[in-house]
Amino acid sequence: MNSRFTSAFTPFAVSLGLLLVMTSAFPTPGPLGEDFKNDTTPGRLLLTTPEKTEALIKRMVDKISAMRKEICEKNDECESSKETLAENKLNLPKMEEKDGCFQSGFNQAICLIRTTAGLLEYQIYLDYLQNEYEGNQENVRDLRKNIRTLIQILKQKIADLITTPATNTDLLEKMQSSNEWVKNAKIILILRNLENFLQFSLRAIRMK
């Protein structure tokens, strides 16, 4: 990590009480495949570029759009009632002004940390998608795999200045519903928010 990142991370990590995890050995370098699917082994260093990482995010956004379209084709009132969707409060990870990812007040170091933390928090919602999504399950599997790859890439940039959040199994239980419309509304809301989250993260990735 260069001195520019070090100086930016240190005060932020201290202010938020982030724990620096010291690794006992350096990870083994490995290339990132053209489809970002060749190796997602934890702890293995992925050799990539900002352009490839940006391409990975854009592919995920396209995948999410395809999944939303698939749901909408089966539901006449798809995404037509924002009020009803808002009632399904899922406490989804979102970008805020303080996260440094917006054009106003942009801070690459802070944005990278928030993006990584948010994607880790999204894992429980991806569990819900895998359990409840009735469309092409290959899309869900690809999305999860690509997000794990992106998390690995981002962790390399922030030198493990973040810890993995505990799995909230209670939340997964609370999200269950026997009502088909409510279930689809939650899936749409998760996909829509994840798409927005990834879009905001692109600004930090594009910075060399």
From Swiss-Prot:
PROSITE patterns: INTERLEUKIN_6
GO cellular component: extracellular space; interleukin-6 receptor complex
SMART domains: IL6
Name the record gives this protein: Interleukin-6
Quaternary structure, from the entry: Component of a hexamer of two molecules each of IL6, IL6R and IL6ST; first binds to IL6R to associate with the signaling subunit IL6ST. Interacts with IL6R (via the N-terminal ectodomain); this interaction may be affected by IL6R-binding with SORL1, hence decreasing IL6 cis signaling. Interacts with SORL1 (via the N-terminal ectodomain); this interaction leads to IL6 internalization and lysosomal degradation. May form a trimeric complex with the soluble SORL1 ectodomain and soluble IL6R receptor; this interaction might stabilize circulating IL6, hence promoting IL6 trans signaling.
Residues found modified as Phosphoserine: S81
Localization of this protein: Secreted
Stated role: Cytokine with a wide variety of biological functions in immunity, tissue regeneration, and metabolism. Binds to IL6R, then the complex associates to the signaling subunit IL6ST/gp130 to trigger the intracellular IL6-signaling pathway. The interaction with the membrane-bound IL6R and IL6ST stimulates 'classic signaling', whereas the binding of IL6 and soluble IL6R to IL6ST stimulates 'trans-signaling'. Alternatively, 'cluster signaling' occurs when membrane-bound IL6:IL6R complexes on transmitter cells activate IL6ST receptors on neighboring receiver cells. IL6 is a potent inducer of the acute phase response. Rapid production of IL6 contributes to host defense during infection and tissue injury, but excessive IL6 synthesis is involved in disease pathology. In the innate immune response, is synthesized by myeloid cells, such as macrophages and dendritic cells, upon recognition of pathogens through toll-like receptors (TLRs) at the site of infection or tissue injury. In the adaptive immune response, is required for the differentiation of B cells into immunoglobulin-secreting cells.
Signal peptide boundaries: 1-29
Cross-referenced InterPro entries: 4_helix_cytokine-like_core, IL-6-like, IL-6/GCSF/MGF, IL6/GCSF/MGF_CS
